[in-house]
Amino acid sequence: MTNIHHHKILILDFGSQYTQLIARRVREIGVYCELWAWDVTEEQIREFNPTGIILSGGPESTTEANSPRAPEYVFNAGVPVLGICYGMQTMAMQLGGLTETSTHREFGYAEVSLRNPTALFDHLNDDATTSQTTLDVWMSHGDKVTRLPDNFQITGMTSTCPIAAMSDESRRFYGVQFHPEVTHTKCGQKLLQNFVVDICGCETNWTAENIIEDAVARIKAQVGGDEVILGLSGGVDSSVTALLLHRAIGKNLHCVFVDNGLLRLNEGDQVMEMFGDKFGLNIIRVEAEDRFLEALKGIDEPEAKRKTIGKVFVDVFDDEAKKLTDVKWLAQGTIYPDVIESAASKTGKAHVIKSHHNVGGLPDYMKLGLVEPLRELFKDEVRKIGLALGLPAEMLNRHPFPGPGLGVRVLGEIKKEYCDLLRKADAIFIEELHKADWYYKVSQAFSVFLPVKSVGVMGDGRKYDWVISLRAVETIDFMTAHWANLPYDLLGKISNRIINEVNSISRVVYDISGKPPATIEWE
């Protein structure tokens, strides 16, 4: 079996908004990497034994006395090092160079003129349509390197930044003031590939097939012949987790699907058909709509609704788990960004905006071991694994759906009547987006039930009924988002269908709020 962790890159995070993007780009090349805080110890680096190290960008200034620094061992480990933006600046400072606050800050596109030859820039411009002497890049910096460390050479410059890239070829140390990880930088992925594959010598073994083989082997080694329980929601993470476990241990996997009454139209039946009938998984379906709605009576505050939904889910899951007396392990669809977020929260710097629906767990007395086969994977990698395991692309590429489901898309108190109306309206919205070839052009689209009544006219009579809001956004990372500029005729068609086909809806509105200041979900 291929050792997918034999060659690996360590990325030290100095706080850049793009740091996770660096890791995803390295993974796309086919090499495993991990993301650690900048203040890691020498012992931890030695234990990880990286094939190469990348220093990320960050918001701090190297001219400040207490700004973050890379561990000195990074430059004594005998492996190649690439510094990006702040990472280049701290490399220069720590190795004897000088950085200063620039009088001309660079944010956005810039043209880098290539200077002395460097392995980092080899064959970047194989495409004959691109220049052989310049690179179009994305800059985001206020400081700049003004004096090189000993044995370094300038490999790139801009009109306002004389040292935009540098290298010490003998020690295989490289720095770039721009961000190769963002798509705005042309040839950025090829630059990272030069570093990871050609300079560090990593083999590209991080593929979907190898990851599946490794995950199955590790599950077998971890749980042996024991039985495992998994909460299956039908979402991407739990679905891929279920199929990996099923491949590894077969009928020893018990999936519990809790139908809480807060799902999309016909979603419960679709989950059972997909995983029970098609894939042959052992699934227990729990009809718990009444239990959830009873617990949610009178609760209209969003955070209280989330907490209640989470608590009831744990209680329902606990009741089913008690019936399976031989279960020794709990499986969860934890993915790598969850691991990173959890680690970051321990620093005390995190500010809670909304509680995450996966936070929490089963009662302590259950004493189950934890199986998390996706904890090394980013979301896009999970989708690739799912595709390789046979899940349909349309399911894997569905828009995100919140853990509390319609519980955060019905504003205020949740009632069955409201959920039923919202389900039908949302199904029409999504159906029309598909028909108009707009579904995959937007990042997320959904309907929201507003518990306010508005006057309308139906035939010769007036009616006083509920309001539905449509929400569609375009985003790269879900940290910021723009409302989608859907065609007016499409919005009109959707509105007419909802008002005519869903009883008790008198008005449809379109949400044109960006993030920030609004969040994507209404609650």
UniProtKB/Swiss-Prot annotation:
Listed EC numbers: 6.3.5.2
Glutamine amidotransferase type-1 domain location: 8-205
Entry binding sites for ATP: S233, G234, G235, V236, D237, S238, S239
Domain GMPS ATP-PPase: 206-398
Pfam families listed in its UniProt record: GATase, GMP_synt_C, NAD_synthase
Keywords: ATP-binding, Glutamine amidotransferase, GMP biosynthesis, Ligase, Nucleotide-binding, Purine biosynthesis
InterPro entries associated with the record: Class_I_gatase-like, GATASE, GMP_synth_C, GMP_synth_GATase, GMP_synthase, GMPS_ATP_PPase_dom, NAD/GMP_synthase, Rossmann-like_a/b/a_fold
Active site per the UniProt annotation: C85, H179, E181
Sequence intervals crossing the membrane: none
GO cellular component: cytosol
Domain of life: Bacteria
Function (record text): Catalyzes the synthesis of GMP from XMP.
Protein name as it appears in the record: GMP synthase [glutamine-hydrolyzing]
Protein's organism: Histophilus somni (strain 129Pt)
